[in-house]
Amino acid sequence: MIYLASKSPRRAELLKKINVEFLLLEAEIEENLVLEGSPAFNAEKLAKEKCSQGIKNAIATNLENYPVLAADTIVVMGNKIYGKPKSSDHAFTMLSELSGQVHEVITGVSVGAWDSEKADIATTVSYTHLRAHETN
């Protein structure tokens, strides 16, 4: 059993696909990108903050001591950093800009327990061209 410190339906779906038992854990943080260091630094920093907040919330609410998994993904194309879309229209605009372009998808991952935490980052992808109906 683990706690997932994320509101991402995709992260929950991925854990279900690999048969990991998990409980969702509240881990609200200010998700503003810090414009210091690399995008990878930012993704890792946000993942660590989510994990730490999740652990604090679990302790404060007397939950059992299970590992906490948190992640944050940042997309980078050229000099532009894409954060979370603010609406479905914003998501459509972002996907349209990325469609057919090579860009980086950087995910910071943090796993922690009451007394320790580990974080890492990974991945570059090539994106195929998307048709308008595929982004809806």
Model-derived segments and spans:
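N-terminal polybasic phosphate/anion-binding patch
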Residues: 1-67, 80-81
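Residue-level signal for inorganic ion chemistry
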Residues: 15, 47, 72, 91, ...
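Short, structured loop/turn "capping" segments at alpha-beta junctions
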Residues: 101-106, 116-121
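Short beta-strand and adjoining strand-loop segment in the mid-core
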Residues: 80-83, 110, 122-127
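Single conserved hydrophobic/aromatic residue that forms the stacking wall/gate
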Residues: 129-136
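Short acidic-glycine loop/turn motifs at beta-strand connectors
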Residues: 77-78, 113-117
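Ordered, amphipathic secondary-structure segments that act as subunit-interaction surfaces
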Residues: 67-73
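Active-site-adjacent loop/tail segments of enzyme domains
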Residues: 42, 73-103
